[in-house]
Design a protein with these regions (language model features):
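Acidic, low-complexity terminal tails and accessory targeting/binding regions
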Residues: 2, 74, 80-105, 133, ...
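Loop-to-helix element that buttresses phosphate recognition and phosphoryl-transfer chemistry
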Residues: 3-5, 10-61, 128-136
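Active-site metal-binding loops of divalent metal-dependent hydrolases
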Residues: 10, 160, 206-208
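Phosphate-coordination/substrate-recognition cap region in phosphate-metabolizing enzymes
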Residues: 34-111
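A generic secondary-structure signal
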Residues: 36, 141-145
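Glycine-rich phosphate-binding loop signature in dinucleotide/nucleotide-binding domains
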Residues: 40-42, 146-151
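Short glycine/proline- and acidic residue-enriched helix-loop micro-motifs
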Residues: 99-134
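A short beta-strand-loop-alpha-helix capping motif that often carries His-Thr
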Residues: 155-166
Length: 223
């Protein structure tokens, strides 16, 4: 039986023109996670990641901390995040102000929740995105690939949306509950699963043991 480690990317650049770019803290979080894995003696036989810049940057930080230059990741576009701007646009086509106050931040994520619900129910189709059923299938295909091709420790670097879909599908929860999981996944949090050729089973969700020290108290982020 193998172990699959689902990792959300490090802190990105929320509110900036280019969100798909780790912040300085995001790079630190990623490298710290790699160091934690190395200290635990983990040796990954494979790495899968989405094709977004923040996925690559997160893996590079993990790889540095892990000191595993020999590992070459398999890029899996099915692990990419949904386009939050496209999701919000389906229910609020007018431009939004940058969410740089608590009120605007809350408003932004309130709209995102409503847009995700509409997409999941097939009541709206965000431009440039797959149908929700196809989005789910891309994630399920990644899990199936791991079951079919591997038997040891595997690392998967993705985003909050795909990870919440993966966890929700393993637990059999309704799509709406996946939205709440999505909003709670912390940057570089680890969700651990065990797997064999027939099934994948969740062991833990959204853990940040690598940041469990006073020195890293301010490193816990959600965006």
């Amino acid at each position: 039986m193998g172990t699959l480690y689902l990792v959300r990317h490090g802190q990105a650049s929320f509110g900036a023109d280019d969100y798909d770019n780790l912040s300085p803290l995001g790079h630190q979080q990623s490298q710290r996670l790699g160091t934690y894995f190395r200290e635990r003696g983990l040796q990954f036989e494979a790495v899968l990641m989405g094709s977004l810049k923040r996925h690559r940057q997160t893996w590079e930080g993990i790889q540095t901390g892990l000191q595993a230059t020999h590992l070459k990741p398999l890029v899996w576009p099915g692990l990419n995040e949904y386009d939050s701007h496209a999701v919000i646009h389906t229910i609020h086509p007018e431009p939004l102000a940058k969410p740089d106050t608590p009120e605007l931040y809350k408003h932004h994520f309130g709209l995102l929740r409503k847009g995700l619900q509409a997409w999941m129910r097939a009541e709206a189709q965000p431009q440039g995105m797959p149908a929700f059923s196809d989005f789910v299938q891309g994630i399920q295909d990644a899990l199936a690939h791991v079951r079919a091709q591997h038997s040891g420790d595997v690392l998967m670097v993705s985003s909050g949306g795909p990870i919440s879909i993966a966890v929700g599908s393993l637990l059999g929860t309704p799509p709406e509950s996946m939205i709440e999981m999505n909003m709670r996944i912390r940057n570089t949090a680890v969700s651990e699963c065990v797997y064999n050729p027939k099934r994948t089973t969740l062991v833990s969700f959204n853990t940040i043991n690598h940041l469990d020290a006073d020195a890293y108290r301010d490193w816990v982020t959600f965006t």
